[in-house]
Amino acid sequence: MPLSDKTSIRFFGVAAYEIINRLGQRILLDPFMSENPACPVAFDSFDHVDLVVVSHAAFDHLGDTEALARRYGCPVICGGEVKAYLVAKGIDAETIRATTWGIRVEVAGIEVQPVECHHWSQIKMPDGTFASGVPMAFIVYADEGVRFYHYGDTAIFSDLKLQAELYQPTIGCIGIANPQEILHRNPMPGRMVTAEMSPYEGALAAQWLGLETVLPCHYCNPMDPEVAEFEKHLKALEAKRMPVPRSIVLKPGDWIEIPAGGGAVRNAA
């Protein structure tokens, strides 16, 4: 029996999201919270967590997964390398569902479809060795008519059109910026000119995926100039009479509510 007539989606900054479905289940996606300078919510402030879904092992996506699993005993869906890391850190292997592209899984009554993601995934294990694996994007079947695409740090590639044909995501997040506030965590020579997708590539990806609503992400500050550039490119595609999704720019802590009848309504934090 549904407890609500809407699906709620809240943005925590970078690529971290919370979905609360109509049954009241809380799903956390790439829960980078404690070390996220933009996140207004503490990982231990929830009354319950029903599922954590992790795209890959980067610190700003794996985030607080280990701490959440310890505190709430919630199941985790992730790739094999993330499972190996969590088990090495003492998380019960039986609470972790490893999967990869194509293997749709159901955990806690929630279906998740992993899809191809052009990126990498690597993590330092407790013993000092490194584990690598296959990064994932994924589609969360949150509610009837609500299929949430999480891009998982993917670069653009043409088979996003195939994913649209096969899975018909309705709403999704697309990374289009480099969060300047956390780049110091990975010191390297030179600079990153773009994130995994430039704003133009992100606009194309959103159009190719056939989304009804797109949430640009991978920023801490919604005033990031790359966010405005993404919006500009979406409008340019629309001016060419191409079907484009409605874009909603959220600041960390903001959420949207999707009524059971469809449509996306923005709410303030």
Explain the meaning of each model-derived region:
Residues 1-26, 33-37, 115-118, 162, ...:
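Zn-dependent metallo-beta-lactamase
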Residues 2-7, 20-27, 104-113, 142-148, ...:
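Beta-strand-turn-beta hairpins that frame and shape the catalytic cleft
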Residues 18-58, 63-70, 78, 121-125, ...:
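Pre-active-site segment of Zn-dependent metallo-hydrolases
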Residues 28-31, 49-57, 77-80, 148-154, ...:
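Active-site neighborhood of phospho(di)ester-bond hydrolases with catalytic His/Asp-centered motifs
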Residues 35-36, 58-63, 83-86, 103-106, ...:
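Active-site environment of divalent metal-dependent phosphoester hydrolases
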Residues 40, 63-72, 87-91, 224-233:
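Metal-dependent catalytic neighborhoods of phosphoester/phosphodiester hydrolases
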Residues 114-146, 154-159, 167, 171, ...:
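Active-site-proximal loop/helix segment associated with metal-binding centers of metalloenzymes
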Residues 155-254:
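Cap/insert and terminal regions of metallo-dependent hydrolase folds
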